Amino acid sequence: MIVATGVDESSLRYRGWRVVLACFLMAFFMFGFGLYGQGVYLAELQRAHGWPGTLVSAASTFSFLLTSVLVIFTDDLLARIGLRSLILCGLSALGASTVLLALMQTPWQLYLAYALMSVGWTGMGTVVIATLLNSWFDRRRGLALSLAFNGATCGGIVLVPLLLSLTGSIGFRSAMLAATMVMVLLVLPVVVGFIRWPAGLPPASGERPADGDAPAPAHSRKALLANAAFWTMVLPIAIALLAQMGFIIHQVTFLEPLIGRASAGLAVTIMAAMAVVGRLSLGLFVDRLDPRLACAASMTSQAAALFVLVQSTSPTALLVCCAIYGFSIGNMITFPPLIIQREIGASSFAAAMGLGTSISGVVSAFGPGIVGLVRSLTGDYTMAFAMCVVLDLVAAGIVLWRPGRRAKLAAS
């Protein structure tokens, strides 16, 4: 709950927008290096060292699973070492990871680099960003989250092509070192200058109580796991992300035989661009919408786009379907913090975000493998993507189930 001070959150003078800028840059580099850049590392490390793709891919999987474990403890880390220290620790770990990726010579260094990347995710990833912005915004919370998380998509659109271009001109090692230096020069000043809790905020909780109100007691992860509102938010998001990750990873393989490599690449670009548009569009209205209803609508639109996609051969229709699908892919990480704030409460926000992100991360990691397995068993992607359609519709149905207007958690 935001302090009732009458502050105009729409004003550009509001300090919270500086925090949004810092979070945008954090998401830009964290997702750029930590997610979208992994395809670059796979190709370049294989080329430089002759390592098998399975070795690098296994390190990537290890990193995502380790991240899913570490983010569970985000609320404990915020209470123990503080917000700014946690973010600076994440920045240092990510920087060390990218430098090590540039300089490594042996496979054990590869796994160390990816372990450091997991620490980076813990300090600069979704949970910290959502918890921080939740404390600064009330009426414009959805817009703030949408703008900040657009940094994630922009990291894929800008940083990855830049890395590829620099690698072609100055080599992978120099490209990674240069990009790391730019990250530190851009992110470090805004973290030191802008990142802080709002005045009067209990630093361990991330909650801002209303005037005259004491903060609600925080609740344990065990209590969250027994809470129906938590599960009707986490399960549908995890299911939708499983289907989403499965489609995204297999998108080019599916489209290339139908429309060619160049057009398949264009489809990926269109989808990424529409993710930015979708986040911005949602951010303008989501604070006036029911987040569960908006989430269900996004999942249904993805199901509809996939349903048409698997039945089409027209290049135009396929590109339009990818655009429609892309419109909602970025919003799957915007809805959980909005639902948590409304139904579980600010005192348990960081704990709920960490636990929910961990669960959805583990579940969604199986998406590419499941889609690939169904494709191998059936010979094409029709049944695999039809499965994704069903999963999206099931997720939309679950997220509309409301166990109560506000979660009632048992005392820790």
Q: Which residues are covered by each model-predicted region?
A:
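Extracytoplasmic gate region of multi-pass secondary transporters
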Residues: Q38-L42, L225-L280, L284
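Helix-loop-helix hairpin linking two adjacent transmembrane segments in secondary transporters
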Residues: A152-A199
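Cytoplasmic helix-loop-helix junction between adjacent transmembrane helices
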Residues: A115-N150
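Extracytoplasmic
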Residues: R18-G53, L70-T74, V160, G246-V252, ...
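A late C-terminal transmembrane helix in Major Facilitator Superfamily
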Residues: E343-T378
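C-terminal ends and interior cores of transmembrane alpha-helices
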Residues: S92-Q105, S301-T313
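C-terminal transmembrane helical hairpin of 12-TM major facilitator-type secondary transporters
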Residues: M271-A275, R279-S281, V286-I339
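Helix-to-loop junctions at the C-terminal end of transmembrane segments
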Residues: L70-G82, R279-D290
